[in-house]
């Protein structure tokens, strides 16, 4: 038997229902915030991620699915969504005009890492990217969008925020941090590598010993220039005004190299201690990194598998939907196919091609999670009627075929 690859999972039944629910909710909220859909390729040139995600990141260093294709191109399966969207933005020369572009995306991402609960080698993300707006109010709106999504999905969260500063204030902080790191011994190999490539990433290390060494490290948000400080204060003010609880985490850095200024992360204890379920921030430098005109960008990405795990833990019930249409005698099936064809213009209809007893049909309708049950037997056929049962409300009656649209 051929099985799915390790760390890759089929989505069906309850998983598929939860996936559809999450995507539908995210899309509705994103559209309400003025975002439109973008779809980018799963396969990109490796250079895109080496320049955007950064050579010092674990993604590029350890986790990319990369290979040489038949055209001798060094390509990889996308490990994250932002870089591809920025590439599309630049390729279409949208960086050359002054209009704001707001996009949302969803789909598969690929990273070769150890599979665990809520983390797979092929995983799914929903994300948004906003280009051309420098205002911190755009950062706040994107955070509020996530708050609304989690509210609709009934997911409890803790919001962490920080400011990573800008090109004006970061060089001095970087200098202070390197001086601090040089004064300490015992950092892991990853931290030593990051110290030379991008020292701020050392703060992101998950090693407990390294974190203990960082207890008295200089803080990002205490080294901000006046402009970054003002924006960070506005961000906190907006969140408070909108009733959003948050915590300033001075050691929060995004795992990717292109972030600046606003950084945020949503964590949940519903699938394990402090599991990240979404994160993002501002990345004004990324467009320029990828040969675009210097501009502004901010966005987030959400891990769908972790959201599904939370929903399933809550025993999320699959809602009944659609119509189950059936016959007790094979001679009525052709007539029912005609009825089903008309109903399918407005409704989801599952038509059974087998003649069965009423109890068997009802059992099958229940297995298929249908909301409405319609059946034709000899008596119904003679009266141009159908037996109707609402499986959610447990209501049943005889209805005329001519009244079907009105009843449904």
From Swiss-Prot:
It comes from the Bacteria. GO terms for biological process: histidyl-tRNA aminoacylation. Coiled coil: none annotated. It catalyses: tRNA(His) + L-histidine + ATP = L-histidyl-tRNA(His) + AMP + diphosphate + H(+). The keyword Coiled coil does not apply. One of its GO terms (cellular component) is cytoplasm. One of its GO terms (molecular function) is ATP binding. NCBIfam families: hisS (TIGR00442). Belongs to the class-II aminoacyl-tRNA synthetase family. Homodimer. This is Histidine--tRNA ligase. It comes from Campylobacter jejuni subsp. jejuni serotype O:23/36 (strain 81-176).
């Amino acid at each position: 038997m051929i099985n799915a690859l390790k760390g890759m999972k089929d989505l069906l039944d309850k998983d598929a229902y939860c996936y559809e629910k999450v995507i539908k909710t995210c899309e509705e909220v994103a559209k309400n915030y003025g975002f439109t859909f973008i779809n980018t390729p799963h396969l990109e040139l490796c250079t895109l991620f080496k320049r955007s995600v950064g050579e010092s990141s674990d993604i590029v260093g350890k986790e990319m699915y990369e290979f040489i294709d038949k055209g001798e191109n060094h390509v990889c399966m996308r490990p994250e969504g932002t870089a591809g969207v920025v590439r599309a933005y630049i390729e279409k020369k949208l960086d050359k005009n002054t209009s704001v572009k707001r996009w949302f995306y969803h789909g598969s991402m690929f990273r070769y890492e150890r599979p665990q609960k809520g983390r797979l080698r092929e995983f799914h993300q929903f994300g948004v990217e906003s280009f051309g707006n420098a205002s911190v109010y755009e950062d706040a709106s994107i955070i509020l969008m996530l708050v609304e999504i989690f509210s609709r999905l009934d997911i409890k969260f803790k919001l962490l925020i920080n400011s990573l500063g800008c090109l004006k204030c970061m060089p001095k902080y970087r200098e202070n941090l390197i001086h601090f790191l040089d004064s300490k011994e015992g950092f892991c190999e990853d931290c030593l590598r990051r110290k030379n490539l991008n020292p701020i990433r050392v703060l992101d290390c998950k090693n407990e010993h390294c974190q203990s060494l960082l207890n008295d490290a200089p803080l990002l948000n205490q080294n901000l220039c006046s402009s970054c400080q003002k924006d960070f204060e506005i961000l906190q003010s907006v969140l408070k005004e909108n009733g959003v609880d948050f915590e300033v985490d001075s050691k929060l850095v995004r795992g990717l190299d292109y972030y600046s200024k606003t950084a945020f992360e949503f964590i949940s204890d519903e699938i394990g201690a402090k599991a990240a379920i979404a994160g993002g921030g501002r990345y004004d430098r990324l467009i320029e990194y990828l040969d675009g005109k210097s501009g502004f960008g901010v966005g987030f990405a959400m891990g769908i598998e972790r959201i599904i795990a939370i929903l399933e833990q809550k025993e999320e019930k699959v809602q009944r939907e659609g119509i189950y249409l059936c016959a007790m005698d094979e001679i009525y099936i052709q007539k029912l196919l005609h009825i089903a064809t008309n109903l399918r213009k407005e409704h989801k209809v599952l038509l059974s091609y087998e003649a069965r007893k009423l109890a068997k049909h009802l059992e099958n309708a229940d297995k298929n999670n249908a909301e409405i049950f319609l059946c034709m037997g000899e008596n119904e056929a003679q009266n141009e009627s159908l037996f109707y049962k609402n499986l959610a409300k447990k209501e049943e009656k005889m209805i005329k075929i001519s009244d079907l649209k009105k009843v449904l």
